[in-house]
Amino acid sequence: MKIKLNNISETMLITLYMRATDAKSEKPILNDKKSEEIISQIDYDFSKFKSAWASYYGVLSRAKVMDNEVKKFITKYPDCVIVSIGCGLDTRFLRIDNGKIRWYNLDLPEVIEKRKLFFEPNERVTDIAKSAFDSAWTKDIKLEGKKLLIISEGVLMYFEEQQIKQFLEILTDNFDSFEAQFDLLYKGTVKMSKKHDTLKNMEAKFNWGVKDGSEIVKLNPKLKQTGLINFTD
C-alpha cells in the first residue's frame, strides 16, 4: 500500500527501514520481525536509505539502549504504564512486553491512522491521535496508582527549543510523578540536516540539540536528571 506522510511524520519510515533491514541480517541487533513484516506491505522508495549506514547503526544502537532501559523500568515496576511520544510505527511494545504493562501510543492523527493498518488491537495498548503539544492527551492516560514511564525516541530534535519547553511543562503540569527517557541530538549536528545521510532526501530537518544531556532539565526546573547514556560509547 502507498503511504503519504508530511514532513516530520515521514521520518518514522527511516527507523522502520533500519529495524527491518536489521531483522534480515545474519546477526540482528533487535531482530524486529514485525518491522520486516510492515515494510513488506508499504509501497515507498526505501532505496534512498539503503546506503545510510551511519543512520543504520545509530538507529539500532539507540533502539537497543532504550529497549534495555525500558526493560529495567518494567523489571522494577511490572505493572507500570508507559507512554510512547511520537510513536510512529514503533514496535517496542512487542519487543519488551511482559504481559502486564499498560501501553499508550501518542502521535498525530495521520500517523495513528497508519498504525491501525499494521497492528492488531490489544486490550493493554491504547492509541492516542493527538499532538504531544496539546495537553489534552494527558487526560487519556489512566494510571490507577501505577508507575509512569514516558519515552520518546527520534522526536525531540525536530522541534524548536520553545516547543520542547512547552512539552516538558505539559508533563510536569499534568503528572505528579513520572520517569522519562529521551534521546537527544548533539548541538553541532543540527545545522547538518542537508548533509545527513537520510534527511538530505526529505523535507524534515533538525531544529534542536544540546551540548550536554543536562541541558534538557534546565528547560524545566521541576525535572531532575537521573542518568545519561552516550550512544557512541
Locate each region found by the language model.
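Rossmann-like AdoMet
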Residues: 1-83, 87-130, 143-144
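Short amphipathic alpha-helix with an adjacent loop that forms part of the alpha/beta core around
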Residues: 135-145
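Conserved beta-strand signature within the Rossmann-like core of class I S-adenosyl-L-methionine
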Residues: 148-149, 171-187
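A short beta-strand submotif of the Rossmann-like class I SAM-dependent methyltransferase core
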Residues: 148-153, 164
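Short alpha-helix
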Residues: 203-230
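Short "lid" loop at the C-terminus of a central beta-strand within the Rossmann-like core
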Residues: 133, 157, 184-189
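A short, conserved alpha-helix within the catalytic core of class I
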Residues: 127, 136-138, 158-176
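Short, glycine-/aromatic-enriched active-site segment of Class I SAM-dependent methyltransferases
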Residues: 187-204
